Amino acid sequence: MRPAAAAVIDVCCVIAFVAIGRASHHHGESIGGLASTAWPFLTGLGVGLVVTRAWRRPAVIVPAGLGAWLGTVAVGMLLRVVAGQGTALAFIGVALAFLGLFLLGWRAVVAGHARWRAATRSRR
Protein backbone atom coordinates (compact mmCIF):
# COMPACT_ATOMS: atom_id res chain seq x y z
CA MET A 1 0.00 0.00 0.00
CA ARG A 2 1.22 3.47 -0.83
CA PRO A 3 2.05 5.71 2.13
CA ALA A 4 -0.27 8.47 0.91
CA ALA A 5 -3.23 6.08 0.73
CA ALA A 6 -2.55 4.83 4.25
CA ALA A 7 -2.26 8.41 5.52
CA VAL A 8 -5.60 9.31 3.93
CA ILE A 9 -7.25 6.31 5.61
CA ASP A 10 -5.74 7.30 8.96
CA VAL A 11 -6.90 10.91 8.58
CA CYS A 12 -10.41 9.68 7.69
CA CYS A 13 -10.44 7.53 10.84
CA VAL A 14 -9.49 10.52 13.00
CA ILE A 15 -12.04 12.78 11.30
CA ALA A 16 -14.72 10.11 11.82
CA PHE A 17 -13.83 9.94 15.53
CA VAL A 18 -14.09 13.72 15.86
CA ALA A 19 -17.30 14.00 13.82
CA ILE A 20 -19.05 11.22 15.75
CA GLY A 21 -17.93 12.70 19.06
CA ARG A 22 -19.12 16.18 18.13
CA ALA A 23 -22.47 14.84 16.93
CA SER A 24 -23.00 12.76 20.07
CA HIS A 25 -22.45 15.86 22.21
CA HIS A 26 -24.71 18.00 20.00
CA HIS A 27 -21.97 20.38 18.92
CA GLY A 28 -22.45 22.29 15.71
CA GLU A 29 -21.60 20.70 12.39
CA SER A 30 -19.43 23.55 11.14
CA ILE A 31 -16.12 22.95 9.41
CA GLY A 32 -14.48 25.35 11.87
CA GLY A 33 -15.77 23.39 14.85
CA LEU A 34 -14.62 20.12 13.32
CA ALA A 35 -11.17 21.58 12.59
CA SER A 36 -10.92 23.03 16.10
CA THR A 37 -11.56 19.62 17.63
CA ALA A 38 -9.55 17.62 15.10
CA TRP A 39 -6.25 19.52 14.93
CA PRO A 40 -4.74 18.10 18.15
CA PHE A 41 -5.49 14.54 17.05
CA LEU A 42 -4.32 15.06 13.48
CA THR A 43 -1.09 16.56 14.81
CA GLY A 44 -0.67 13.54 17.08
CA LEU A 45 -1.31 11.24 14.14
CA GLY A 46 1.42 13.00 12.18
CA VAL A 47 3.85 12.73 15.08
CA GLY A 48 3.12 9.02 15.51
CA LEU A 49 3.59 8.32 11.80
CA VAL A 50 6.87 10.24 11.63
CA VAL A 51 8.31 8.72 14.82
CA THR A 52 7.62 5.19 13.54
CA ARG A 53 8.70 6.01 9.96
CA ALA A 54 5.36 4.68 8.84
CA TRP A 55 6.00 5.58 5.20
CA ARG A 56 8.28 2.53 4.98
CA ARG A 57 5.51 0.00 5.69
CA PRO A 58 2.36 2.05 6.28
CA ALA A 59 -0.15 -0.79 6.45
CA VAL A 60 1.52 -2.90 9.16
CA ILE A 61 0.13 -2.90 12.69
CA VAL A 62 3.57 -2.67 14.32
CA PRO A 63 5.12 -0.15 14.23
CA ALA A 64 2.99 2.04 11.91
CA GLY A 65 -0.45 1.29 13.35
CA LEU A 66 0.70 1.33 16.94
CA GLY A 67 2.51 4.63 16.40
CA ALA A 68 -0.50 6.14 14.65
CA TRP A 69 -2.83 5.05 17.46
CA LEU A 70 -0.73 6.00 20.46
CA GLY A 71 0.58 9.18 18.86
CA THR A 72 -2.92 10.31 17.98
CA VAL A 73 -4.23 9.75 21.50
CA ALA A 74 -1.20 10.80 23.58
CA VAL A 75 -0.15 13.87 21.61
CA GLY A 76 -3.76 14.74 20.84
CA MET A 77 -4.73 14.74 24.52
CA LEU A 78 -1.61 16.69 25.49
CA LEU A 79 -2.37 19.35 22.88
CA ARG A 80 -6.00 19.50 24.03
CA VAL A 81 -4.78 20.27 27.56
CA VAL A 82 -2.39 22.95 26.28
CA ALA A 83 -5.19 24.47 24.16
CA GLY A 84 -7.64 24.43 27.08
CA GLN A 85 -9.99 21.95 25.41
CA GLY A 86 -10.09 19.45 28.27
CA THR A 87 -9.50 15.71 28.60
CA ALA A 88 -11.87 13.86 30.89
CA LEU A 89 -10.74 10.34 31.83
CA ALA A 90 -13.77 8.82 30.11
CA PHE A 91 -12.90 10.75 26.94
CA ILE A 92 -9.39 9.33 26.98
CA GLY A 93 -10.83 5.83 27.30
CA VAL A 94 -13.26 6.37 24.43
CA ALA A 95 -10.47 7.83 22.28
CA LEU A 96 -8.19 4.87 23.01
CA ALA A 97 -10.95 2.38 22.17
CA PHE A 98 -12.33 4.06 19.04
CA LEU A 99 -9.01 5.08 17.53
CA GLY A 100 -7.45 1.72 18.41
CA LEU A 101 -10.28 -0.11 16.69
CA PHE A 102 -10.12 2.06 13.59
CA LEU A 103 -6.40 2.82 13.20
CA LEU A 104 -5.35 -0.75 13.99
CA GLY A 105 -8.49 -2.34 12.54
CA TRP A 106 -8.06 -1.32 8.93
CA ARG A 107 -4.47 -2.55 9.07
CA ALA A 108 -5.63 -5.90 10.46
CA VAL A 109 -8.11 -6.20 7.58
CA VAL A 110 -5.35 -5.43 5.05
CA ALA A 111 -3.04 -8.00 6.69
CA GLY A 112 -5.79 -10.63 6.74
CA HIS A 113 -6.59 -9.99 3.09
CA ALA A 114 -2.89 -10.32 2.16
CA ARG A 115 -2.65 -13.64 4.03
CA TRP A 116 -5.82 -14.88 2.33
CA ARG A 117 -4.48 -13.91 -1.11
CA ALA A 118 -1.15 -15.62 -0.41
CA ALA A 119 -2.93 -18.78 0.74
CA THR A 120 -5.19 -18.74 -2.32
CA ARG A 121 -2.22 -18.37 -4.66
CA SER A 122 -0.28 -21.18 -2.99
CA ARG A 123 -3.17 -23.60 -3.54
CA ARG A 124 -3.11 -23.12 -7.30
PLM segments and residue spans:
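Membrane-helix boundary connector in multi-pass membrane proteins
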Residues: L78-V94
